[in-house]
């Protein structure tokens, strides 16, 4: 029995297949394979596979960046990143829904109601389509 296990391990090493080569699936669209982070079949250049984690619908965060649907969100200070709900998060004094900054949101009173709805002291916010955030 021990001989067979040892033979199997030797075979894996000689075949250049290691336990670290196993593809790790992260959510529906992201994966890690052979030290690279992927969105679908596209490599996310610069993404760190050791710190990559799914944080919401199509949102991935590593130690340097936040990605939405495989695209790096610009001007993010990762040390100030805070997840507020499934699709809402804040960075510095800005509130975001997925990859969209919510203009004039009141950061002190902002509350997430569910994955697509939120409110602050001035208004309520509703997600409609990928590119449209409505407030009322």
Short names for language-model regions:
Residues 11-19:
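Hydrophobic h-region of N-terminal signal peptides that target proteins for export
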């Amino acid at each position: 029995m021990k001989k067979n296990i040892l033979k199997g391990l030797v075979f894996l090493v000689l075949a250049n297949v290691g336990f670290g080569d196993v593809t790790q699936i992260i959510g529906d669209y992201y994966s890690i394979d052979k030290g690279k982070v992927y969105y679908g079949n596209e490599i996310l250049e610069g993404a760190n596979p050791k710190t990559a984690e799914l944080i919401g619908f199509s949102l991935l965060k590593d130690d340097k960046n936040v990605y939405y649907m495989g695209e790096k969100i610009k001007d993010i200070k990762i040390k100030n990143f805070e997840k507020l709900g499934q699709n809402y998060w804040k960075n510095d004094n800005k509130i975001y829904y997925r990859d969209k900054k919510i203009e004039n949101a009141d950061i002190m009173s902002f509350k997430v109601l569910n994955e697509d709805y939120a409110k602050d002291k001035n208004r309520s916010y509703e997600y409609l389509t990928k590119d449209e955030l409505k407030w009322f």
